[in-house]
């Protein structure tokens, strides 16, 4: 690899703004803010949503009600729901 063309790769703490959960991961981001985490000082990146707060990962996701739309479609096109 050529020197001087790749961004610096470093460990960064990502903090979920909603829950306060912190994750250490590698990144090329260079934030100004730092944080003490597990005895070391890391650059800090604040994120709005992470796997700790996203409904898909927390199991609190909501499914859209398709029942009414399916019935409306069947009625519109004269499809009988009986087998």
UniProtKB/Swiss-Prot annotation:
InterPro entries xrefs: Ribosomal_bL28/bL31-like_sf, Ribosomal_bL31, Ribosomal_bL31_B, Ribosomal_bL31_sf
Instruction: Kindly list the residue ranges recorded as spanning the membrane.
Output: none
- Can you tell me which residues the record assigns to a coiled coil? none
GO cellular component terms, A-Z: ribonucleoprotein complex; ribosome
| Keyword Secreted applies | no
Q: Name one GO biological process term.
A: translation
Q: Give this protein's Gene Ontology molecular function annotations.
A: structural constituent of ribosome
SUPFAM superfamilies named among the record's database cross-references: L28p-like
Matching Gene3D superfamilies, A to Z?
A: Ribosomal protein L31
Q: Which UniProt keywords apply?
A: Ribonucleoprotein, Ribosomal protein
Q: What domain of life?
A: Bacteria
Q: List the disulfide bonds.
A: none
Q: Kindly state the subunit structure of this protein.
A: Part of the 50S ribosomal subunit.
Protein family: Belongs to the bacterial ribosomal protein bL31 family. Type B subfamily.
Please report the name of this protein according to its UniProt entry.
Answer: Large ribosomal subunit protein bL31B
Source species of the chain: Lactobacillus gasseri (strain ATCC 33323 / DSM 20243 / BCRC 14619 / CIP 102991 / JCM 1131 / KCTC 3163 / NCIMB 11718 / NCTC 13722 / AM63)
User: The organism's lineage?
Assistant: Bacteria, Bacillati, Bacillota, Bacilli, Lactobacillales
This protein's gene is called rpmE2
